[in-house]
């Protein structure tokens, strides 16, 4: 070949390399906040759905149906079921002892505390895990971290768009239009999804993703045992953030006698300094979780069809499992 031909071949090779890079960067990742979704499935599907031995499987079947619908509607390239290896990490409890304290069923000295969970849901969790494993859907939980932290780390490392499916508003903090990170929040069980992007956050709360951390800790969250700042509700928190920018700006205003804080706001914020100092670390999801090396590609065929067939028969997974398998294969 003449010199020009070699140059053309080299250019073509470079273009192909660029195309491969672009393809890798645009893979759509879907992250499931698994526990929040199977809780919703449990309460959204009648308890009359049973296995042959009488065990309830409403959460299992509801979750499988939900995943099938998610895959069909959003077509992710990669899918991870993120798990709570520790639903109440010690490092968060050390900072705010009330964190999720009301949900502790039993304290465990050398491990995660046992969480209160409905009697007919608890036996379904191992079934959910076994079915996900047999399907080949990546399931990731990391010791000493919540699923939120696993999600935050996966989202932070992603090179393409990310859909986070969760019933936990705390994950609104990860919304980032520039990086294509959005939250799909289930309404009315798991039947309808609210697409949460920056425009929705600003319209609803007046903040962006990172600003939601400041809003949440000021407002507090009884469901997580976060006290918030007394007298500072959601609307007041949003107004303060609009006026002073962020939490640091609000606390600087407490020390500035010329600021436009009301006397009662100044007093309550001043009295809450200890809480405000530690709450960001509790509310903000970790982005540095040591994730295992797993294949996150959406499976087209089950990893263990024999085990899956046995699970389907034992637990009466019937149409729910078949619908998911059909969706994965199309």
Segments from the language model and where they lie:
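N-terminal amphipathic/basic-hydrophobic helices that include classical n-h-c signal peptides
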Residues: 1-21
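N-terminal non-cleavable signal-anchor helices
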Residues: 13-16, 23, 166, 255
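Non-catalytic nucleic-acid-binding/docking modules located in mid-to-C-terminal regions
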Residues: 20-26, 75-80, 137, 178, ...
